């Protein structure tokens, strides 16, 4: 009996998935990711929240890169109920951010030029230095994929491959940094005004994630309203909400009437509320800028939701 699963074009494997420029970048991601993970796990070592985050980031990116390469090479992605172009663009951007963060954190917390005062200390140092180098190369490999797949002017592309789509991933990532600072001794519950800021961060984060999920799942066509128009309206509202938080949060955290204008001298490093409040303030302005840029780009994009 003949097979009912004949692949399009008569070929079961797609060699371009590993030989094209994007495919080459993905193969480098696998090589650098496996090398970085192995160097740290074998002898480099890690510990604490920072080390666990780095290992989790590298492991997550490596696992999904294997999935992407395998699906493209075997053409199985055509069987998945999602928009493959949106999925790969969103993952590449997220992996770039995760690997960039890990490439900064691991050398900062674990790498030293001098040898540790322990047996085989110089070997541990060398492994950590090598892991730091490959972590940087891993970030560059993911950044290269983002650059290669990003939609160009006049090009028909999926939403997540546009500047606006990529910015959605960055906005959600920055919001996660804000949430991390909020739960770390930020004292946001002292005033209703700062609680409003937390509500703003949460609402915008959930809406941004919803936009990404709808795009990746390919469900943007059944919303009853043009998806690009909904995105523009939401982005405009997010700019207004973040603008309010950008004014309210610094006032209620750093004005002498409500908080501390400067870092208290008795504030312990690693558990200082003022530090967390400063991180929230900085990344509030970062996300405000990202939403403004997103709004500007959203006026000009045209995308195909099913790619």
From Swiss-Prot:
Keywords noted in UniProt: Membrane, Repeat, Transmembrane, Transmembrane helix
GO CC annotation: cytoplasm; membrane
Organism superkingdom: Eukaryota
Domain MARVEL: residue ranges: 17-154, 159-303
Predominant localisation class: membrane
Bilayer-crossing regions: 53-73, 90-110, 129-149, 163-183, 198-218, 232-252, 278-298
Bilayer topology term: Multi-pass membrane protein
Cellular compartment(s): Membrane
Family according to the record: Belongs to the MAL family.
Protein name per UniProt: Myeloid-associated differentiation marker-like protein 2
Gene symbol of the encoding locus: Myadml2
């Amino acid at each position: 009996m003949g097979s009912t699963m004949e692949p399009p074009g008569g070929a079961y494997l797609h060699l371009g998935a590993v030989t094209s420029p994007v495919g080459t970048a993905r193969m480098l991601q696998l090589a650098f990711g496996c090398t970085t993970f192995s160097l740290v796990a074998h002898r480099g070592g890690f510990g604490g929240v920072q080390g666990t985050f780095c290992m989790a980031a590298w492991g997550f990116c490596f696992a999904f890169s294997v999935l992407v390469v395998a699906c493209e090479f075997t053409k199985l992605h055509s069987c998945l109920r999602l928009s493959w172009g949106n999925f790969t663009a969103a993952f590449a951007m997220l992996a770039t951010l995760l690997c960039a963060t890990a490439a900064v954190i691991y050398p900062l917390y674990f790498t030293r030029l001098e040898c540790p005062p322990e047996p085989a200390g110089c070997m541990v140092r060398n492994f950590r230095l090598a892991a730091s180098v490959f972590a940087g190369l891993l970030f560059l490999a993911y950044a290269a994929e983002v650059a290669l797949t990003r939609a160009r002017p006049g090009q028909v592309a999926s939403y997540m491959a546009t500047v606006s789509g990529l910015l959605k991933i960055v906005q959600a990532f920055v919001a996660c940094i804000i949430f991390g600072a909020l739960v770390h001794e930020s004292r946001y519950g002292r005033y209703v005004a700062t609680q409003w800021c937390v509500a703003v961060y949460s609402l915008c984060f959930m809406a941004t994630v919803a936009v990404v999920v709808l795009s990746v799942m390919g469900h943007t066509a059944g919303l009853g309203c043009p998806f690009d128009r909904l995105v523009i309206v939401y982005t405009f509202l997010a700019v207004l909400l973040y603008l309010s938080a950008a004014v309210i949060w610094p006032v209620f955290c750093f004005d002498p009437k409500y908080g501390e204008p400067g870092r208290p001298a008795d504030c312990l490093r690693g558990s200082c509320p003022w530090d967390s409040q400063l991180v929230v303030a900085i990344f509030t302005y970062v996300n405000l800028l990202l939403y403004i840029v997103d709004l500007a780009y959203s006026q000009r994009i045209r995308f195909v939701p099913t790619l």
